[in-house]
Amino acid sequence: MAYDWVWLLTDYGRRDGFVAACHGVIARIAPAARVEDITHEVPARDVRHAAVVLAQTVPHLPPAVIVGVVDPGVGTQRRGVAITAGGSVLVGPDNGLLGWAADALGGASTAVELTEPAFRLPSPAHTFDGRDVFAPAAAHLAAGAVLEALGPVVPVEDLVRLAQPRVEVGPGRLDTEVLTIDRFGNVQLAASMAELAVAGLTAGSVRIRAGGRSHVVAVGVTFADVAPGGLVLYVDSAGQVALAVNGGDAAAELGLESGDPVTVTGESPLR
C-alpha cells in the first residue's frame, strides 16, 4: 500500500540542516509523497514529551507514514521499528516514543525491525538515523514497499513502552502528574475529564497542591472564565485536565515541570 503523506516529528529544531536532510531523502525516494512537519521543537532528548505530542496529533492526520525521532540512544543496540496502527505506519526508534501514538490509532497491529540495508542509505552514520534509517524507510513505505520487506517481525508486546503516568482517583481527590507543558505555559495533567468526574471535582472551585504550595482554583471551561491573571482548571483540547493562567504562564506561576506531582481535592484544606 502506498501513502500520499509522510509526517515528521523530531527534536532537531530549525537552526541546522537536519530537517531539510530528512525531507530531501524522502523526496528523492518517494517524490509523489507529500512531506509535512508535526513539529521539530520537541525539547532535546525528551522522549515522553514527543510521545505525548505524537499521540495527541495522530488521530487528526490522514492515513500516512508518520516518523518520530527523539533518539538519545542513537548508535546503540536499540532497535529501529515500523509499526502499523489504524491504517498508518509509525516509524522511529523503539524507545517508547511510538507506543502511545499506536494506542491512539487503535493499537499496534504489526511491527518490524528496520534491518534490511536496501531500505536505508548506503554507509549510514552512527549518529543520524533520522536521515539514514527512518527517513528512507518511511519513503519506501510511502512508495508502496511491503512492511515485512524492511526487516523481521517484532511481536508488538515486545515493543518498548513508556511508564504510564500517575493517575490515582478517590472520592474528592485526584493524585496525578504533569504530562506536558505547551508554549503558552498551560500545564496538561495526566488525568482525563472522566477521572476528574469520578473524583467529583468538575464544578465550583478546587484546591491544587503543586510545587510545594496549595492554591484555590476555579473550575472552568476556558481561560476567560477567570479574571486576567487568575488560575483555572479546565479540560483542554486533547481531553486532558489542565491548568492555565488567563493571559499568563501557569507553569511559571506554579513552578511546575513535566513529571511533577499534582494533587487536586475539594476546596477545603488538604490534611
Model-identified regions with their sequence ranges:
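Anionic-ligand-binding alpha/beta catalytic cores of soluble enzymes and soluble regulatory domains
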Residues: G107, L121-T202
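Surface-exposed interaction regions enriched in Ser/Thr/Asp/Glu
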Residues: D260-E267
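Conserved active-site and cofactor/substrate-binding residues in soluble primary-metabolism enzymes
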Residues: G17, A21, A30, R45, ...
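Active-site histidine-anchored catalytic micro-motif
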Residues: W5, I29-A32, H49, H60-V70, ...
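N-terminal glycine-/serine-/threonine-rich phosphate-binding loop
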Residues: M1-Q77
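A conserved acidic, glycine/proline-rich C-terminal tail/linker
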Residues: Q188-G255
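Structural motif
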Residues: W5-W7, A33-E36, A64-V67, G80-A82, ...
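Conserved subregion of the PPM/PP2C metallophosphatase catalytic domain
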Residues: G86-L98, G106-R120, I181, G200-V217, ...
